[in-house]
Amino acid sequence: MPEINTNHLDKQQVQLLAEMCILIDENDNKIGAETKKNCHLNENIEKGLLHRAFSVFLFNTENKLLLQQRSDAKITFPGCFTNTCCSHPLSNPAELEESDALGVRRAAQRRLKAELGIPLEEVPPEEINYLTRIHYKAQSDGIWGEHEIDYILLVRKNVTLNPDPNEIKSYCYVSKEELKELLKKAASGEIKITPWFKIIAATFLFKWWDNLNHLNQFVDHEKIYRM
């Protein structure tokens, strides 16, 4: 694996690069484990390295979507606006559990606490709904990028927030119209959004949002959408 100098990067974020992500093939079958660092180097991504990930979309009882702006300390896509929470299950027994995507949902609960300070008891795995999966690839800069099969998870709940400033620069709840305005700002270069959020907003998000009481029609655990 290539050697990359991380001395100039945020120390807390560099520590997280040692976490072990789940390596998968293009059909989301586990084939091994690799560090977060190696999973996110473009040099490895270009050779086909692919890992499992998730994206959470949390709506409050007013049907507003919780967005976050990634902190400037983040190694990939710093300062970008994105959906509620995006991260990776780790290669450990609890988060490798594949039955009903329980491992991924446990990972989402863990990261909602770590990033946004949401108490674990407010987002139990059984209240995190697994819809479908998308497969995408994107570069952050010349060194770092993403290549993931992303589990799409929806939560509908009012939650307590206490964000970690090392993870999150800002957050806000938005209506559909407010998100459309934010997407226009991103298109004009006024703000930055993450590539996966851009993809999901352009394809599925508003359909889900229009049908929050009838999400079963969008549940598809067989297909992986190639974006």
From Swiss-Prot:
Catalyzes the 1,3-allylic rearrangement of the homoallylic substrate isopentenyl (IPP) to its highly electrophilic allylic isomer, dimethylallyl diphosphate (DMAPP). Mg(2+) binds at residues 40, 51, 146, 148. A motif (Microbody targeting signal) lies at residues 225-227. InterPro entries: IsopentenylPP_isomerase_typ1 (IPR011876), NUDIX_hydrolase-like_dom_sf (IPR015797), NUDIX_hydrolase_dom (IPR000086). This is Isopentenyl-diphosphate Delta-isomerase 1. PANTHER family: ISOPENTENYL-DIPHOSPHATE DELTA-ISOMERASE (PTHR10885), ISOPENTENYL-DIPHOSPHATE DELTA-ISOMERASE 1 (PTHR10885:SF5). Keywords: Acetylation, Cholesterol biosynthesis, Cholesterol metabolism, Isomerase, Isoprene biosynthesis, Lipid biosynthesis, Lipid metabolism, Magnesium, Metal-binding, Peroxisome, Steroid biosynthesis, Steroid metabolism, Sterol biosynthesis, Sterol metabolism. The active site is at 86, 148. Substrate binds at residues 36, 70, 74, 87. It is an enzyme of class 5 (isomerase). One of its GO terms (biological process) is response to stilbenoid. The modification N6-acetyllysine is found at residue 176. One of its GO terms (molecular function) is magnesium ion binding. It comes from Homo sapiens. Residues 49-199 form the Nudix hydrolase domain. It is found in: Peroxisome. One of its GO terms (cellular component) is peroxisome.
